[in-house]
Swiss-Prot record:
A GO-annotated cellular component: extracellular region
Main location: secreted
Keyword Nucleotidyltransferase part of the UniProt annotation: no
Biological source species: Haloferax mediterranei
Full protein name: Secreted proteinase
Lineage top rank: taxon: Archaea
Amino acid sequence: DTANDPKYGSQYAPQKVNADVDQGVXXXHPEL
């Protein structure tokens, strides 16, 4: 999941992280 990947995590707004969660990409997002 990109939210936990140092290459991507901080680039994405919370809305992107939430979209990933909705798609079932992964879990455990410290940014939420």
